[in-house]
Amino acid sequence: MQVTVETLEGLERRLNITVPAANIEDAVTAELRNIAKNRRFDGFRKGKVPMKMVAKMYGKAVRQDILGEVMQRHFIEAIIKEKINPAGAPTFAPVENKEGSDLVFNATFEVYPEVELKGLENITVEKPAVEVKDADVEEMIETLRKQQATWTEVEEAAEAGKRVSIDFVGSIDGEEFEGGKAENFPLEMGAGRMIPGFEDGIEGKTKGMEFEIDVTFPEDYHAENLKGKAAKFAIKVNKVEARQLPELNDEFVAKFGVAEGGIDALKAEVRKNMERELKQAVKNRIKEQAIDGLVKENEIDVPAALIDQEINVLRQQAAQRFGGNVEAAMQLPRELFEEQAKRRVVVGLLLGEVIKAHELKVDEEKVKAIITEMATAYEDPTEVVTYYEQNEQMMNNMRNVALEEQAIDAIIAKAQVSEKEVSFNELMNQPA
């Protein structure tokens, strides 16, 4: 076998491979003999059919199969010999494959980029310095009360904190538009669900009032046909309601699975959950900054084949989120996923290089700690831990998580790390 390597554009490579004719002919002959020996032919005893007849009937098909197998096998031998690491499946193209002549073919493919980590010391990470305070717990309790609240109709004007039921019809230049009409629409005043100016126009109005308001859709509104458009809404207030918060008593506490200890026990449980969420949020914020810095300091070429694979993964995930229609999801335009897919590939390649450069191995104690921490969010943590320990696939997933965390720790160890005091709400409400 003769092999030459061509470097094409970017990460693309081409192997030109020559396989001696004897190798092909020997393989074809062996397969034809196998057919002659094991298949039945009318008029002949098994294994007694003439080879010329077998070759005439099956020779062309067998040769095609053998050529495919030979190209695949010799491609693998060639990349091992040349120490090449393909990033995707090759495209084979026969150049010369006449019977009796050497097989000459090429294989075109992409390789993984050569990554030499740099700039880890330039990465800046601002670690949130934050704790759950009593006021945060009280605010969360109030949020729980609001979630359990009931609404009672009142003869009062609409204002922040009240809820109104309205009919409305929207129009632009005198023409109604799609999605601009509703009846008995519940709107909590002050929640900021509607476009700017909509709630302001309702404030102060009472049951039975009919009126019109003028608003302008934001330039970044999700509906393309409404961006920046001036609109008029005809509105009728059907009723105004006030929120009735539940009392902080044993009945309220019981709704959250706290059987004993009253409101103090609920507060303790709420604090524990908030501290667990806070710990994860701090970890995520640090990880996000470390990865952002890693990507910024290390620009690399990305194999298109890996991006295509990741796009398909994202499409399948989209299908799972939206009803499981994989076929429909696979038809979604690649542009929807391309940027995210490329980012994920880049991050994966760079973290892989961090793991390699620092010779990181999975820390099984860290794996156990991650599972134990995660299990605390469930009613029976011991059962969750046991479930993971008995499921090898789940354990392997957790090992990957642990190894990624070890890679992040290695980045942080070389980065410029500072602390910044923030409140619980500031951290938890930061945009992703």
Curated annotation (Swiss-Prot):
Q: Which Pfam families match?
A: FKBP_C, Trigger_C, Trigger_N
Compartments (UniProt record): Cytoplasm
A biological process (GO) annotation for this entry? protein unfolding
Q: Which residues cross the membrane?
A: none
Query: Keyword set for this entry?
Result: Cell cycle, Cell division, Chaperone, Cytoplasm, Isomerase, Rotamase
Q: What is its EC number?
A: 5.2.1.8
Task: Please give an example of a GO cellular component term from this record.
Answer: cytoplasm
Q: Name one GO molecular function term.
A: protein folding chaperone
- What domain of life does the UniProt record list for this protein's source? Bacteria
What are the residue boundaries of the PPIase FKBP-type domain, all occurrences included? 161-246
**Which reactions is this enzyme annotated as catalysing?**
[protein]-peptidylproline (omega=180) = [protein]-peptidylproline (omega=0)
The family annotation for this protein states: Belongs to the FKBP-type PPIase family. Tig subfamily.
The record's function comment reads: Involved in protein export. Acts as a chaperone by maintaining the newly synthesized protein in an open conformation. Functions as a peptidyl-prolyl cis-trans isomerase.
Free-text note regarding domains: Consists of 3 domains; the N-terminus binds the ribosome, the middle domain has PPIase activity, while the C-terminus has intrinsic chaperone activity on its own.
Record's protein name: Trigger factor
